[in-house]
Amino acid sequence: MAEKSKVLIIGGTGYIGKFVVEASAKSGHPTFALVRESTLSDPVKSKIVENFKNLGVTILHGDLYDHESLVKAIKQVDVVISTMGMMQLGDQVKLIAAIKEAGNIKRFFPSEFGMDVDKTNAVEPAKSAFAVKVQIRRAIEAEGIPYTYVSCNCFAGYFLPTMVQPGATVPPRDKVIIPGDGNVKAVFNEEHDIGTYTIKAVDDPRTLNKTLYIKPPKNTLSFNELVAMWEKMIGKTLEKIYIPEEQILKDIETSPMPLPVILAINHATFVKGDQTNFKIEPSFGVEASELYPDVKYTTVEDYLGHFV
């Protein structure tokens, strides 16, 4: 069997980064995490770094804004995965420049991990946030860097514990607010599974210069189907309040930041159906649960079961 690629994760202590680092280490890839000195003095982040070390991850000290440290780190690996947060997405141009200079990278995964930004019709302010990811994609392609874009749609941990109810901390028990008509399908993926599928793609020629869509059939549900599943689990019918699209668009315009970004993403997801309103063509994409049927993914039903 071919040797597994050495993987460097940048942004590994962030929300989705932790799961990608863990999946990489557990699957036997020599795994490296680029960590800033300041991260080590953060009590929460330093615990995450300790956990990485226990998994056998090599911690490299460096910074996105220090070109030399970046090139030095990149030269030690074969694959770079960026899991940076929204505020740093545009700065991935620095990463692209370092990858180009290092000249040894077999694959780059930019920070995506949401809906396919080339296929969305999101309104502002989500439109501008997605546009940054689009710019990064075009820059990667222009430089001829081999890539995989991971489109995992909704993080289960963001959406399912509250079922997208404003201000809630638990799933609804009495009434539920449903955006649009509730018939549009969205996709919900558990974060460990996102990490697992991402790492499976690292050495897979089928995912080279393609978008890897994580769209397992059991996790592709409309809002109405989600509510019906939850009602069955708790043995109770909820009062349903449907919010028309006009009202959502008005709320996006009048709410204080950062709410409009969240509302605009939810509008694209649950009203426009931007995660499921196109067919995956072999020319641009592949679907993870089809490529890797051996992965026992967490279904939405399994996930919601913890909250009954």
UniProtKB/Swiss-Prot annotation:
The keyword Phosphoprotein does not apply. Belongs to the NmrA-type oxidoreductase family. Isoflavone reductase subfamily. It comes from Nicotiana tabacum. It catalyses: (-)-dehydrodiconiferyl alcohol + NADPH + H(+) = (S)-isodihydrodehydrodiconiferyl alcohol + NADP(+); (+)-dehydrodiconiferyl alcohol + NADPH + H(+) = (R)-isodihydrodehydrodiconiferyl alcohol + NADP(+); (2R,3S)-dihydrodehydrodiconiferyl alcohol + NADPH + H(+) = (S)-tetrahydrodehydrodiconiferyl alcohol + NADP(+); (2S,3R)-dihydrodehydrodiconiferyl alcohol + NADPH + H(+) = (R)-tetrahydrodehydrodiconiferyl alcohol + NADP(+). It is an enzyme of class 1 (oxidoreductase). This is Phenylcoumaran benzylic ether reductase TP7. Keywords: NADP, Oxidoreductase. Coiled coil: none annotated. GO terms for molecular function: oxidoreductase activity, acting on NAD(P)H, oxygen as acceptor. Its EC number is 1.23.1.-. Oxidoreductase involved in lignan biosynthesis. Catalyzes the NADPH-dependent reduction of phenylcoumaran benzylic ethers. Converts dehydrodiconiferyl alcohol (DDC) to isodihydrodehydrodiconiferyl alcohol (IDDDC), and dihydrodehydrodiconiferyl alcohol (DDDC) to tetrahydrodehydrodiconiferyl alcohol (TDDC). CDD domains: PCBER_SDR_a. The gene is TP7.
